[in-house]
């Protein structure tokens, strides 16, 4: 029911704004800065670095944290690309051939279909699935931190892993 939330806001005479995509952009920038631009030799090092991010650390304890979906922890990671974090679910399955040609050896995304996994494996790309809710939590936390700085009270709910930075 796409109209459930807007209709509830209207009944409650509350304003409503959807910040999902901007928050996805925030987590993509966060991961680029903290993971993609770092030097890692092996895939397990990338997984360990992700596991030190509080939202992912908590998600891991819940059984929904970052995991390797394609490849091996002992593989060289090569260049890292943050993919499928923002802009919808999945792009074209043909992107893996282009990513491999560009020297990308490891991708990090929120989720991945079996078709995409097969294409990643075909082109020897390691695929780390960071997790949807934990990744969303990073982005929304970065946004909420800014609201709190402006004096807006934040009450976490709906599965948000609230971490203040």
Residue ranges with predicted function:
Residues 1-109, 114-115, 119, 125-165:
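Non-catalytic interface/targeting segments
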């Amino acid at each position: 029911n796409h109209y459930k939330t807007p209709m509830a806001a209207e009944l409650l005479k509350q304003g409503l704004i959807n910040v999902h995509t901007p928050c996805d952009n925030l987590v993509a920038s966060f991961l680029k800065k903290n993971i993609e631009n770092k030097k890692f030799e092996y895939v397990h090092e990338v997984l360990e670095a992700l596991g030190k991010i509080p939202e992912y650390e908590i998600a891991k304890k819940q059984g929904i944290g970052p995991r390797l979906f394609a490849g091996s922890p002992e593989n060289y990671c090569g260049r890292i690309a943050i993919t499928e974090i923002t802009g919808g679910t999945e792009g074209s399955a043909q992107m893996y051939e282009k990513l491999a040609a560009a020297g990308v050896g490891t991708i990090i995304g929120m989720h991945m279909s079996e078709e995409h996994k097969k294409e990643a494996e075909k082109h020897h790309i390691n695929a780390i699935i960071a997790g949807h809710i934990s990744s969303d939590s990073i982005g929304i936390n970065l946004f909420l931190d800014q609201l709190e700085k402006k004096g807006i009270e934040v009450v976490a709910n709906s599965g948000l892993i609230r971490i203040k930075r």
